[in-house]
Design a protein with these regions (language model features):
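Short, glycine/charged-enriched secondary-structure capping and boundary segments
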Residues: 106-109, 177-181, 200-201, 225-228
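Residues within well-ordered alpha helices
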Residues: 112, 154, 194-195, 231
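A general structural motif
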Residues: 88-90, 159-160, 182, 203-209
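Short, catalytically relevant binding-site loops at active-site mouths
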Residues: 170-172, 191-194, 217-220
Length: 233
């Protein structure tokens, strides 16, 4: 476990190894989930990347912040989906960087929204930028806060009652760091499960077996396990 190696090097005051191990941590949350005394190792790792406690730069990220500030995301400069929308939509769909990279997810989500007869707007096509989570994980708190503030303004100005997300990484930071009082933040697996339960969409069971992988941020990070299984079950 990376945490064991990291703590060992901290005791030895081995600055080079501390930097190497801390930088390689994927922040999956496993150490936090199994820690018998409740130490939140992932948060400690982020803090280590942000301060100069051990004499090295807190800047662990090679992300080009210029593009992010200009309104682009990490992987693509524009969304892969172009849909019409009206001014009375209540669902705001934030695709995020990873979902835009794997466009099949966003395309399927949009198709489900259409099938359910739901009005929606895609935030990425209306000024939304990166959620700020990559910057936060890299210890760049101030830059992350700037992104959070800009996205918050867009969300509140949209008049949406629900913010729908596909990316677990985006979902986690929207739940934890954004102040969106009165606006529901929901992952698409939760939303699909709700639509099925309410009878707003019908699912034809194919009789096929599936293997489902719990994303670290969605499962350990946010405690969402049952909804995805019900949706595909």
């Amino acid at each position: 476990d990376a945490t064991v190696y990291l703590n060992r090097q901290i005791k030895r005051n081995n600055e080079r190894r501390i930097e190497e191990i801390s930088d390689k941590c994927l922040l999956c949350g496993k150490c936090t989930a199994v820690c018998p005394v409740g130490v939140e190792g992932d948060k400690l790792r982020i803090a280590q990347r942000s301060i100069r406690k051990y004499g090295y730069s807190p800047d662990y990220s090679n992300i080009d912040t210029k593009d992010l500030k200009n309104g682009d995301n990490i992987f693509v400069s524009t969304s892969n989906i172009n849909v019409s929308h009206n001014e009375n939509e209540r669902i705001l769909y934030f695709q995020g960087c990873m979902t835009s990279l794997t466009s099949g997810i966003s395309q399927s989500t949009v198709e489900i929204l259409k099938k359910a007869g739901i009005d929606y707007k895609i935030m990425d096509e209306n000024g939304g930028i990166c959620c700020g989570r990559p910057m936060w994980m890299a210890g760049r708190f101030e830059q992350a806060k700037q992104m959070i503030e800009k996205n918050t303004e867009i969300i509140k100005a949209s008049g949406a009652t629900t913010l729908l997300l596909s990316c677990p990484i985006c979902y986690k930071i929207f739940k934890e760091r954004y102040k969106l009082e009165g606006i529901e933040v929901i992952h698409h697996t939760e939303f699909i499960d709700r639509l099925i339960t309410q009878g707003r969409i019908s699912v034809r069971r194919a009789g096929t077996s599936f293997v489902y992988h719990d994303p670290c941020e969605l499962g350990r990070g946010c405690g969402i396990y049952e909804e995805p299984r019900r949706a595909i079950g």
